[in-house]
Amino acid sequence: MGKVLRKPFAKAVPLLFLAATWLLTGVLPAGASSPTNAAAASLTEAQDQFYSYTCNADTFSPSLTSFASIWALLTLVLVIIASAIYLMYVCFNKFVNTLLTD
């Protein structure tokens, strides 16, 4: 029996490249190099509220629209997808090798 070599990730590589390109061009806005005075004032006010003794986990809600939270979620999704692809590949190869050797 000849071994058939296939490229299992041939379709995934262009999709990952497009996703990375979209992320780098779409998430980073061109004109947002520095915050305005109103944004800086609201940031200072938010920091004062965050560090006050009345702020605890019950009263402070994290924002899912910040760059850091979006980046963390995308990283989490990427790690989950990469782990799933790796585990499928390893399990499939082990399964095929077990079938061929027995």
Swiss-Prot record:
PTM statement from Swiss-Prot or TrEMBL: O-glycosylated. Contains alpha 2,6-sialic acid residues.
Cellular compartment(s): Virion membrane; Host membrane; Host Golgi apparatus, Host trans-Golgi network
InterPro entries referenced in this protein's UniProt entry, alphabetically: Herpes_glycoprotein_N_domain (IPR005211), HSV_GN (IPR034707)
Record topology, Intravirion segments: 91-102
Signal sequence range: 1-32
Keywords linked to the UniProt accession: Disulfide bond, Host Golgi apparatus, Host membrane, Membrane, Signal, Transmembrane, Transmembrane helix, Viral envelope protein, Virion
Recorded superkingdom: Viruses
Function per UniProt: Envelope glycoprotein necessary for proper maturation of gM and modulation of its membrane fusion activity. Also plays a critical role in virion morphogenesis.
Subunit structure: Interacts (via N-terminus) with gM (via N-terminus). The gM-gN heterodimer forms the gCII complex.
Protein name (database record): Envelope glycoprotein N
Natural source organism: Epstein-Barr virus (strain B95-8)
Protein encoded by which gene: gN
